[in-house]
Amino acid sequence: MQKHSSGAGCAAGQTAGRASRIPTMPTGRVRAAPARGITTETRASMSTADELLTLKPDTTIAARAFGVAAEMRVPAFSRRSEYVPEVDEGYRFNPETTLAILAGFAFNRRVMVQGYHGTGKSTHVEQVAARLNWPLVRINLDGHVSRIDLVGKDAIVLKDGQQVTEFREGLLPWAVQRPIALLFDEYDAGRPAVMFVIQRVLEAHGKLTLLDQNRVIVPHPAFRLFATANTLGFGDPTGLYHGTQPLNQGQMDRWNIVTNLNYLSAAHEVEILRARVPAYDTEQGRATLDAMVRVADLTREGFVCGDLSTVMSPRTVITWAQNAAIFGNVAFAFRISFLNRCDLLERPIVAEYYQRCFGEELAESVVATEANRQ
């Protein structure tokens, strides 16, 4: 795990590229459909699956618009469909990871984003797709996703008043035939039987064979495949990610690009917090956010040194800041956002980190505990 340097003296630093605000494409009158269903306006334009079958990218965006120093133009869609993620105007991109994802969209590369929890791996792919107006479907490969879920199955349906057996496509053949960016979340938690179904489509022009249908599906030219994972397929030596599995290295070899997205620089993390929690976008609020990020860095360094068994992710820091804005109490928000999840024996250490950064003793700290005993 890479860390920022500090007085603790037991971590290496990791630099992140500069943060960038990405201009969104004009979307005309059509907006992405809300989660509750499809709006009439979207349905009238291009929201149905059948219309997606013929949809192709019809414009391009320069990679430099994403803050990436590369001479690359990325295919994009001029209009949105219901499958396009919502744009987060406050999102900050990591240049290296963004470049890898853009290459996946532009050159049909299979891209895996690996990193620790809460670093924004899935959101990174979603926000690039959102700005390209590229339809995206996200599948969480938990232990209950089966081969039938992905490939499909025979189902009994009513036709002309009669019960007949009909094959219902799973999500994989449905997506392969359309201009969909398919994102497999928690890729290293997938069951082996499911992973081998995915293996064939990992090749750039890999055709999907449906044995039950005696049918071979040719991928849509704009079909793209991405994945996120906490590990690199060699198991979990940290003990943080129970449920992950070693991955077949023959399958890992089929991923064209593997990029790492781990913890960010302190300045980058503070910028993300300011964008996510506008209430702290003041001089005093900035000082509070700086202290929050320092606490998070100390937990990461403590993990590397073996003092802690858990770390504070960027997602947790955002949650802490949001809860602090809700309750108006930074210490209480810290307790309910992170401290209560720590091992009882490790809470005094975490409370000490908090005291170093905020100059305030928590009830869990060693000093406060000793004072109460006296």
Residue ranges and their predicted role:
Residues 31, 42-43:
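Long, low-complexity intrinsically disordered regions enriched in Ser/Thr, Asp/Glu, Pro/Gly
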Residues 1, 22-25, 30, 38:
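Short hydrophobic transmembrane-like helices used for membrane targeting/insertion
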Residues 11-13, 32:
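Residue-level detector of structural "landmarks"
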Residues 45-286, 294:
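AAA+ P-loop NTPase catalytic core and its hallmark functional loops
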Residues 45-81, 98, 265-266, 270, ...:
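Alpha-helical lid/collar subdomain of P-loop NTPases
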Residues 2-4, 14:
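Low-complexity, intrinsically disordered or signal/transmembrane-proximal segments
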Residues 5-6, 20, 45:
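Serine residues within intrinsically disordered or low-complexity segments
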